[in-house]
Amino acid sequence: MHKTIYLVTDDAKMDFDTLYHKVEMALDGGVKLLQLREKKSSSREFYNNALKMKYLCKKYDIPLIINDRVDIAQAVDADGVHLGQSDLPLTVARKILGPEKIIGISARTVEDAMLAEKNNADYLGVGAVFPTSTKNDAKVISEKVFHDIQAKVSIPIVTIGGITLNNASTLINRGVNCIAVVSAILNQDNPKEAAIYLNNLFK
């Protein structure tokens, strides 16, 4: 997961057809990972939307990660799942999905991060690194905690939370290799241009 833009969707912001169109533009701009997060949808809607996104991701040859729902990830044969601390335990998700699937874990403390690595998580989602309006319960972690996590684990770290076109370079200058964004791409009139801009920051 080297120098990558990771796009996370938000079904609270727009209808699925609009989202699909914006995601396609973002993938065209070089987004390399997509996480489908559906907090409002029924299981049937989530499943149908995940299938559509899977075909889109296949077209661009990038992984589709499902937020929270191991059952949906399994049902559509997605590339992986991203789990929070209150979701199904990583070890259980691994038994269900198998060794080949990507499993990411949200971590806000060094202890969470080390346990996730011990249990063979593929990457960590660490944040929020800035205040964010996308997740109301997201608390900002200190730069010290972030660096402590970096120092203690060797698996890839994805930074998330409040990352915008204006502050992304601050993180990249700190040596961050992967940033996860929502609004920074999906709220733009031209998601492709936003994705290109973020990718260029790594250069």
State what each model feature region is:
Residues G161-G162, G175:
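A short glycine-leucine-enriched loop at secondary-structure breakpoints
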Residues M1-L88, K95-Y123, I141, D148, ...:
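Conserved N-terminal beta1-alpha1 strand-loop-helix module at the mouth
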Residues N177-A184:
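Short, electropositive alpha-helical surface patch
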Residues N120, R174-N177:
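As written
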Residues L88-P89, T132:
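A short, polar/charged loop-to-alpha-helix boundary motif
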Residues A73, F130-N136:
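A short acidic, helix-capping loop that chelates divalent metal ions and anchors anionic groups
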Residues E38, A128-F130:
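Short, histidine-centered active-site or binding-site loop motifs used for metal coordination
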